[in-house]
Amino acid sequence: MEAPAAHDCRNPQFSELSRFWELEPGTDCGTFGIRGYKPISLSWIGSDSVNTLPSSPAPNHTATDPVAYTTNEARIQLSVRTKIAQGLLTHLETARRDSLWFGYTQQSNWQLFNGDISRPFRTTDHSPEITYIYPLDAELPGGWRLRYGGLTLVHQSNGQSEPLSRSWNRTIVSAGLATGNDYVIKGELWNRLFEGEGNDDNPDISDSVGRAEITGLWNIDRKYTLGVVLCFSL
């Protein structure tokens, strides 16, 4: 078998996790190139209720005029990242490479089917982040291998002013496990950064969105992946 070509983050001879985070020199595609990050999607969302009058325990953060939103809407998510540095702590190693990334994710809920109020965007959330990834290769039971550990600082905001302003900051500790290219498990545990009572838009947001997340992926083949995401309010 020929050795994997250098500088190719799409080379199938490397594992999916190694290519995604460019954990080895052979998976390196350089810095400041645009990569995909979280799923880029257009989906239909339905529920049995919708929040027409957003409120928060924070003072002056409760809407006064309800909006006639409907329970069916479209959701659009865009997400990209770029590697801004590499080899920070592994510059003397030849088999693995750490990296620093900047990512941006935008998710919009669009009242596409609500012609009565001119189909507005109900909300758009912006999430810039900085992530450091350190490559690992520890054997685990059942043929699993611990492939990386990570630390992320992320800000999330809806970009609005009071009383609808909602934002928070958190640090995330993450890790990724894999069995070859077939199955991947990614875990995240986060801690919200304290903002002070006068600046906190969402005092109880952790009770709603959780404090940890586990993602399981089955790579059916090179084109298709089946995944499930579990969130926990610890």
Locations of regions flagged by a protein language model:
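Acidic/polar low-complexity segments with low predicted structural confidence
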Residues: 36-58
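N-terminal Sec/ER secretory leader and immediately downstream segment
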Residues: 23-36, 49, 63-67, 74
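Outer-membrane pore/translocation modules
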Residues: 54-63, 70, 87-222, 229-232
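Cleavable N-terminal export/targeting peptides
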Residues: 1-20
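Long, low-hydrophobicity, solvent-exposed regions enriched in small/turn-prone and acidic residues
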Residues: 70-78, 83-85
